[in-house]
Amino acid sequence: EVSAKLDGLPVKYRIETLNWKEFNYKPEVSFAIAYGEKEIFLKYYVRENFMKAEKTETNQMVCEDSCVEFFVSPEADGIYYNLEFNPIGTCLLGTGTSRADSRRADPEVISRIRRLSSSGSMPFTERTGDLEWTLTLAIPLEVFFHHDIKDLKGKTFRANFYKCGDNLTVPHYVTWNPVGTINPDYHQPEYFGTLRFV
């Protein structure tokens, strides 16, 4: 039901910014986002030439697979959350103020994120071709456990959305909002864009 409603939204946002010239492969990636009383709803739409989902355990390095990511900072305290998913919905959730002090969340907290994958739940090695997949997420506000968020209406968060694949045949790093670092690094809250819940 959530997936179908996100499909019906009039606006999809593209993850299409290439920030690092040595990584010039760009898959087709977009997302739809909405919110409810206690959840953020997010759906990624991906079309790429290389696809992998080998990680099956919570908090494994899913960025080494085909990976979609949502980094979000709910308040101006410098703390952000990085939610990273492979095509079968395996999730890494970290939180901190930088890459250096980021800590993994408790798997019990992560288990509250509802996930629906078009790729099923079984792991697979790299596939090649003209490959399409989607991932729908329902992220409860309690996942943002450093912050006491009661509701979203009227709130403004800072965020960025990413697609990567560190260990694919052709690695790639694509962003929604531009990132101005010399090398690929998504842990850059100063380059987050604005996310308004109207």
Residue map of PLM features:
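Structural preference for beta-rich elements and adjacent junctions enriched in aromatics
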Residues: 1-198
